[in-house]
């Protein structure tokens, strides 16, 4: 039906007869000549119809936007004044010889040349995908998967599919359940990840596995979550955590280089606890230069009293965390009030700020917002501790840990945005390591920080300790610009250690047998040391396309309620 794609033509094709297929993007009837822009997934090119060909011109005059057509014509160079160098095809046009209309189009319910409300976009997704930005996102997503597959093949990884209909095994989120027609009162679960299957592949002797896998989690949604999502799933035998990270660094560096021509610099590494103490989150955006500073040993804010006092053993239940904000004095009162309101959402304790004035020595600079003036000595120490300079502002808060870190971490993000401290053209990859193996939920029960198959450091658990939250996991998350794009760990390959972890998690022997017996049995047969990671393809694509929502990089996404507006799913089943 066609000889070429619209966006691939250039001046080297001048004089050639070609055939194109696509959609009318724009038309202009100038009485003696008629121009249309024809569009396909590769781009747009201008087509010229001359009135000298009366029948052809008359047929072209009936064209409207989004008609699906075929054009036969000759490539010709535009006259100089009509060349459009902002288009890849702007130096040429097609002189039409034949026109075929495959299908007419009604006026579209969305505008492909401007923004549309998201509900309309998702309802008419098949039309929304015609937008150049959406086509670009889909093409980039495709290119990313090709780069990853080529990298994996080069590094001797095997692409192996694992089951979609599987057994329900608790992994953190709720499962999507599929009833079995043949096995009455029994159910399949859609996989939250291929975790156990890829570990079984390691036991089977497959050294290096990967899969671009569809996963399903029935959890609360937000802009960077979907109920079904795609992950780059990877597992290797006989490699430690450091070597796994090196492989992933090479792969991610290759993707960034080939997609956006950016060479990522050294991947930094922080422990989980250092990340919390320095940035208030385990997913810090390192483009933001603001860091949290513990100043408890300098000052302490008494509860409900707006004054600074010397540290006191009786008041050390709270800690004091400060931040020095570069050029913070440029913030107007509305911004500062908004920060106080932000803090008040999480605590009744007051947020304080200190302004640093004048180009005099640091020990002489001070201007504060305290109702009771602090001792100058403490203020000098605070300014010195935070390395504050002229024009900076210091914020600090007294609260219990870890809440104080969480609050100041949120404030840090807002300040970075409001003061334009973030270089949005830079990339800061970061590994977060040494997570706690366990944490407690709202019922004060131990749960896995990642999943129950994560190994502790050194493959040991001292069961005599009373606080299992102190046990460090051999795990690692990859964070880029504040987004977690991957999470992995060394896995447990010892049967008794796996049982110990299950017991700590409250998974008794009966539950172990019902849910994990197949896996525990497999661990008996020469299980190799192994490790792996899962990277979010959707999030990676979101970052590389500079999108702000996962829905912009998935062809047919769900809403925040898990609905597909295009098809109306979920829906009642009507039997024929």
Curated annotation (Swiss-Prot):
Family matches, as PANTHER family: ASPARTATE--TRNA LIGASE, MITOCHONDRIAL, ASPARTYL/LYSYL-TRNA SYNTHETASE
Residue numbers binding ATP: 217-219, 226, 484, 536-539
HAMAP family the UniProt entry points to: Asp_tRNA_synth_type1
Role played: Catalyzes the attachment of L-aspartate to tRNA(Asp) in a two-step reaction: L-aspartate is first activated by ATP to form Asp-AMP and then transferred to the acceptor end of tRNA(Asp).
Protein name: Aspartate--tRNA ligase
Family (UniProt): Belongs to the class-II aminoacyl-tRNA synthetase family. Type 1 subfamily.
Spans annotated as Aspartate: 195-198
Gene, per the UniProt record: aspS
One Pfam family matching this protein: tRNA-synt_2
Catalytic activity of the protein: tRNA(Asp) + L-aspartate + ATP = L-aspartyl-tRNA(Asp) + AMP + diphosphate
SUPFAM superfamilies associated with the record: Class II aaRS and biotin synthetases, GAD domain-like, Nucleic acid-binding proteins
Gene3D superfamilies on file: Bira Bifunctional Protein, Domain 2, GAD-like domain, Nucleic acid-binding proteins
Domain of life: Bacteria
NCBIfam families linked: aspS_bact, PRK00476.1
GO terms assigned for molecular function: aspartate-tRNA ligase activity; ATP binding; nucleic acid binding
Species assigned in the record: Buchnera aphidicola subsp. Baizongia pistaciae (strain Bp)
GO CC annotation terms, alphabetical: cytoplasm
Residues binding L-aspartate: 171, 217, 450, 491
Transmembrane segments: none
């Amino acid at each position: 039906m066609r000889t070429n794609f619209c966006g691939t033509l250039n001046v080297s094709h001048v004089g050639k007869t070609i055939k194109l297929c696509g959609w009318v993007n724009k038309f202009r009837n100038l009485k003696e000549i008629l121009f249309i822009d024809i569009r396909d997934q590769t781009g747009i090119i201008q087509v010229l119809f001359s009135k000298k060909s009366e029948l052809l011109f008359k047929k072209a005059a009936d064209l409207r936007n989004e008609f699906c057509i075929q054009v036969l014509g000759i490539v010709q160079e535009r006259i100089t004044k009509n060349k459009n160098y902002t288009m890849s095809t702007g130096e040429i046009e097609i002189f039409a010889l034949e026109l075929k209309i495959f299908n007419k189009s009604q006026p579209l319910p969305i505008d492909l040349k401007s923004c549309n409300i998201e509900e309309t976009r998702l309802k008419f997704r098949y039309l929304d995908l015609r937008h150049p930005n959406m086509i670009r996102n889909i093409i980039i997503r495709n290119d990313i998967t090709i780069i990853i597959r080529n990298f994996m093949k080069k590094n001797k990884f095997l692409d192996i599919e694992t089951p979609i209909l599987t057994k329900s095994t608790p992994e953190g989120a709720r499962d999507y359940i599929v009833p079995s027609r043949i096995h009455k009162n029994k159910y399949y679960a859609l996989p939250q990840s291929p975790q156990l299957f890829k570990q079984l592949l390691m036991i089977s002797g497959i050294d290096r596995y990967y899969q671009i896998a569809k996963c399903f989690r029935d959890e609360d949604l937000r802009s960077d979550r979907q109920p079904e999502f795609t992950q780059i799933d990877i597992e290797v035998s006989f490699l430690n955590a450091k070597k796994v990270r090196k492989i992933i660094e090479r792969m991610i560096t290759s993707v960034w280089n080939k997609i956006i021509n950016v060479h990522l610099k050294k991947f930094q590494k922080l422990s989980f606890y250092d990340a919390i103490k320095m940035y208030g989150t385990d997913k810090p955006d390192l483009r933001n230069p603001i860091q949290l500073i513990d100043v408890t040993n300098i000052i302490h804010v008494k509860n409900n009293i707006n004054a600074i006092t010397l540290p006191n053993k009786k008041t050390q239940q709270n800690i004091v965390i400060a931040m020095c904000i570069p050029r913070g004095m440029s913030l107007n009162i509305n911004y500062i009030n908004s920060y106080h309101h932000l803090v008040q959402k999480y605590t009744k304790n007051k947020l304080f700020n200190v302004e640093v004035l004048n180009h005099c020595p640091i020990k002489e600079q001070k201007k504060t917002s305290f109702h009771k003036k602090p001792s100058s000595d403490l203020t000098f120490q605070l300014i010195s501790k935070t390395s504050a300079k002229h024009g900076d502002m210091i914020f600090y808060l007294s609260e219990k840990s870890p809440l104080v870190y969480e609050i100041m971490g949120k404030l840090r993000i807002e300040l970075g945005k409001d003061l334009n401290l973030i270089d949005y053209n830079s990339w800061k990859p970061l590994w977060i390591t040494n997570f706690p193996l366990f944490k407690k939920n709202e019922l004060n029960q131990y749960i896995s920080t990642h999943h129950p198959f994560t190994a502790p450091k050194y493959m040991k658990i001292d069961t005599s300790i009373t606080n299992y939250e102190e046990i460090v996991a051999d795990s690692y998350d990859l964070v880029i610009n504040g987004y977690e794009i991957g999470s992995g760990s060394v896995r447990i390959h010892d049967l008794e250690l796996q049982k110990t972890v299950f017991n700590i998690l409250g998974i008794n022997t009966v539950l172990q047998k019902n849910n994990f017996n197949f896996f525990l049995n497999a661990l008996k047969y020469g299980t190799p040391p192994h490790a792996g990671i899962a990277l979010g393809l959707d999030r990676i694509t979101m970052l590389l396309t500079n999108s702000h929502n996962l829905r912009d990089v998935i062809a047919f996404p769900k809403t925040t309620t898990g609905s597909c507006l295009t098809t109306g799913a979920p829906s009642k089943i009507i039997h024929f």
